[in-house]
């Protein structure tokens, strides 16, 4: 049995959970999330907690036990607190701004790169160089942050590019001239 999976997921106040078969719907102040869990697990709600247990003793069920518990826990945390990722833009002339629901990034290309925010994700920019991607769905926030970073990943020689806040970039020594 999974050590993570056997812990119940506490449900805070102002959050409601509906379970029908393998479909879990979570509603809270930050939004509403719905997910269909994979086969091999059973989900139940008692008191103010959601419990995930394997439906049988097969290897597949035991593998998915901890995963499903974590997915439900992330849904509950997302609708109550929300998730966010911060990215730093480093480089001369590199900047970002928000126009409506679009993020416009100038990262050294001949044209600015525009990204639309999907449903449930918001972009915020501070000082033209700090981008915050936030929303209720942890997976969606992480994917959008990775797409923003993918516009201009940090390079190892000067460190220019878009990186996660707190990410360490291994720097390389440049070429040495002939002396």
UniProtKB/Swiss-Prot annotation:
Pfam family, one: Ribosomal_L6
InterPro entries for the chain: Ribosomal_uL6-like, Ribosomal_uL6-like_a/b-dom_sf, Ribosomal_uL6_a/b-dom, Ribosomal_uL6_bac-type, Ribosomal_uL6_CS
GO molecular function, one term: structural constituent of ribosome
SUPFAM superfamilies: Ribosomal protein L6
Assigned keywords, A-Z: Ribonucleoprotein, Ribosomal protein, RNA-binding, rRNA-binding
One of the record's GO cellular component terms: cytosolic large ribosomal subunit
Swiss-Prot/TrEMBL GO biological process terms: cytoplasmic translation
Known function: This protein binds to the 23S rRNA, and is important in its secondary structure. It is located near the subunit interface in the base of the L7/L12 stalk, and near the tRNA binding site of the peptidyltransferase center.
Family, as annotated: Belongs to the universal ribosomal protein uL6 family.
NCBIfam families (UniProt xref): L6_bact (TIGR03654)
Assembly notes: Part of the 50S ribosomal subunit.
Entry protein name: Large ribosomal subunit protein uL6
Species in which this protein is naturally found: Synechococcus sp. (strain RCC307)
Encoding gene, per UniProt annotation: rplF
């Amino acid at each position: 049995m999974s050590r993570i999976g056997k812990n119940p997921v506490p449900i805070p106040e102002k959050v409601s959970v509906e379970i029908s078969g393998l479909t879990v719907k979570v509603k809270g102040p930050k939004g509403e999330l719905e997910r269909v869990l994979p086969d091999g697990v059973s989900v139940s709600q008692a008191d103010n907690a959601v419990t995930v247990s394997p439906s049988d003793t097969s290897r597949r069920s035991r593998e998915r036990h901890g995963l499903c518990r974590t997915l439900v826990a992330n849904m509950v945390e997302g609708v109550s607190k929300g998730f966010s990722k911060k990215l730093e833009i480093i480089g001369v002339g590199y900047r970002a701004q928000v126009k409506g629901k679009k993020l416009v990034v100038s990262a050294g290309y001949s044209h600015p790169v525009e990204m639309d925010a999907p449903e449930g994700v918001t972009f915020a920019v501070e000082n033209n160089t700090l981008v915050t991607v936030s929303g209720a769905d942890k997976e969606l926030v992480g994917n959008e942050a990775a797409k923003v970073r993918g516009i201009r990943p940090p390079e190892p020689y000067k460190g220019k590019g878009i990186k996660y806040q707190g990410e360490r970039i291994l720097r390389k020594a440049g070429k040495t001239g002939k002396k």
